[in-house]
């Protein structure tokens, strides 16, 4: 307070004000700060004072033959004085206006080809339908999503070689175009861009957009294909969502979808053959999607799906350590466990052989309408923090986590026989039998689970067996969070070949 008074006192004296406003800056440290290096230290200020000058732009001398010295209003467009330190002409911003209005019109045929991704986006938005806005709590999960629709699936290195070959064909440097897609794209683009007058650097930037998949880790509630991600800012906020139907599909989303379908068919067929691994690899090598070999797509495509992961693992590619169970993607974020077969008795005295996971583990669970963090030990749920859109979604997540925990009270809550079958009329494995049973009716499971008093933690509440929220009691270990839970993005590992079939499909359930 004393300092402020002192400063106010100083500022009230006219001499102080004069010193501060009129004296030149000649302190070496300040001069150094603003003059060392080529990086502009205050671009906004620089632009302001440059534009206040009469001739802030410099241009090649040829400009004097292409632009008159004065415009129709008699204002000077360029100065006869040379720019100090170069042999360029100093030009007024008015010259830009003159050029835009009266300059030559070039051939525009290349613009839609170069800015293809932008033109296509405009078309998609024009033909898309925006529906009503709903106000509700949005549960967003950070996921790795594709942010530029319409791209090919080249790796950064492959794209770099294609771009160099198309834009700078005479530059020195070894470029090896090996893959079929590289050669096709190069040929196509060279033909498209004959006599193109757009700056090569801009062409290179735009080609990169077209050829390489760009992904970001973004909070999303709802559709994750690239045609939805490009309008993310229009379709979801913190407390609202707007319905949207894209006005067109794009190749990369189709490829992702086709890849999942192809991988599922291949895994299904390989599973019943004499040598599953050899047969799976043979099918991956002989399959094409949209004219590109499936093995090439698998190397570049980051789609995380069970069957796709099995194919990648079989090829010795890196896959993420996630697996699916009960419609949720589980990712282990810490801990480890060993598997051991154990026989357990249900409440109906039916014997089940389950693979018990011994050890402490933490998981994130990500579903379409709910997310959760699960901490568990051997056959024991320690903590479950759930976040979901509504009561139904939260209940689904709790059932899946309780079954996954393999707790004895869950197995004892079974009433009646477990005899669920899949579409091929084969009996489901015990874990899925249990899941199906409780998905039909979880009343006994929730009642048998037990409740506990809870502490008042900000952003967290309890949930009772009848699914009503409470701030005093909650089912043992279970809490509801107002915020979403992020998908875990950094646990990646390489699955050894010999165990790919088992490890990748569902390490915790097979």
Swiss-Prot record:
On whether tRNA-binding is a keyword of this UniProt record, the answer is: no
- Where's it found, cell-wise? Host mitochondrion; Host cytoplasm, Host cytosol
Can you quote a single GO CC term? host cell mitochondrion
Keywords, comma-separated and alphabetical: Host cytoplasm, Host mitochondrion
Q: Which InterPro entries match?
A: Flu_PB2_2nd, Flu_PB2_CAP-bd, Flu_PB2_middle, Flu_PB2_N, PB2_helical
User: What's a Pfam family in this record?
Assistant: Flu_PB2_4th
Note whether S-adenosyl-L-methionine occurs among the keywords.
Answer: no
Q: What does this protein do?
A: May participate in the inhibition of type I interferon induction through inhibition of the host mitochondrial antiviral signaling protein MAVS. The knockout of PB2-S1 has no detectable effects on laboratory infected mice.
Specify the protein name: PB2-S1
């Amino acid at each position: 307070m004393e300092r402020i008074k002192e400063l106010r006192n100083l500022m009230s004296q006219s001499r102080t004000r004069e010193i501060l406003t009129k004296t030149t800056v000649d302190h070496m440290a300040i001069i150094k700060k603003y003059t060392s290096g080529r990086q502009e230290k205050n671009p906004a200020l620089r632009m302001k004072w440059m534009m206040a000058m009469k001739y802030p732009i410099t241009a090649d001398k040829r400009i004097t033959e292409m632009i008159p010295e004065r415009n129709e209003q008699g204002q000077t467009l360029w100065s006869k004085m040379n720019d100090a330190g170069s042999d360029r002409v100093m030009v007024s911003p008015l010259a830009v206006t003159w050029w835009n209005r009266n300059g030559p019109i070039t051939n525009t045929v290349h613009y839609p080809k170069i800015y293809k991704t932008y033109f296509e986006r405009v078309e998609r938005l024009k033909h898309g339908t925006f529906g009503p806005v709903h106000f509700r709590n949005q549960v967003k999960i950070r996921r790795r999503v594709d942010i530029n629709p319409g791209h090919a699936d080249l790796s950064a290195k492959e794209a770099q070689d294609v771009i160099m070959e198309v834009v700078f064909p005479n530059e020195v440097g070894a470029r090896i175009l090996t893959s079929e897609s590289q050669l096709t794209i190069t040929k196509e683009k060279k033909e498209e861009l004959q006599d193109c007058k757009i700056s090569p650097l801009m062409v290179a930037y735009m080609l990169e957009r077209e050829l390489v998949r760009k992904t970001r880790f973004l909070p999303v509630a709802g559709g994750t294909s690239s045609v939805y991600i490009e309008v993310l800012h229009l379709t979801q906020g913190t407390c609202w969502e707007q319905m949207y139907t894209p006005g067109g599909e794009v190749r990369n989303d189709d490829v992702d979808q086709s890849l999942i379908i192809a991988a599922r068919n291949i895994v299904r067929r390989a599973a019943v053959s004499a040598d599953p691994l050899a047969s799976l690899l043979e099918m991956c090598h002989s399959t094409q999607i949209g004219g590109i070999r499936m093995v090439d797509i698998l190397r570049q495509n980051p789609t995380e799906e069970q069957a796709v992961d099995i194919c990648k693992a079989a090829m010795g590619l890196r896959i993420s350590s996630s697996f699916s169970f009960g419609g949720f993607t589980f990712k282990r974020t810490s801990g480890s466990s060993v598997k051991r077969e154990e026989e357990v008795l249900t409440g109906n005295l039916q014997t089940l052989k389950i693979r018990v996971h011994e050890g402490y583990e933490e998981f994130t669970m990500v579903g379409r309408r709910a997310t959760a963090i699960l901490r568990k030990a051997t056959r024991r749920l320690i903590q479950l923090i759930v976040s979901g859109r509504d009561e139904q979604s939260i209940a689904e997540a709790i059932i899946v986590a309780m079954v996954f925990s393999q707790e004895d009270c869950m197995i004892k809550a079974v009433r009646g026989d477990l005899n669920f079958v899949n579409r091929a009329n084969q009996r489901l494995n015990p874990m899925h039998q249990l899941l199906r049973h409780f998905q039909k009716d979880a009343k006994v499971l929730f009642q048998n689970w037990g409740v506990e008093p809870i502490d008042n933690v900000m952003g967290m509440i309890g949930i009772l067996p009848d699914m009503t929220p409470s701030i005093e009691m909650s089912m043992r270990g279970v809490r509801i969070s107002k915020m979403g839970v992020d998908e875990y993005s950094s646990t990646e590992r390489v699955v050894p070949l010999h165990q790919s079939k088992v490890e990748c499909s569902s390490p915790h359930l097979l």
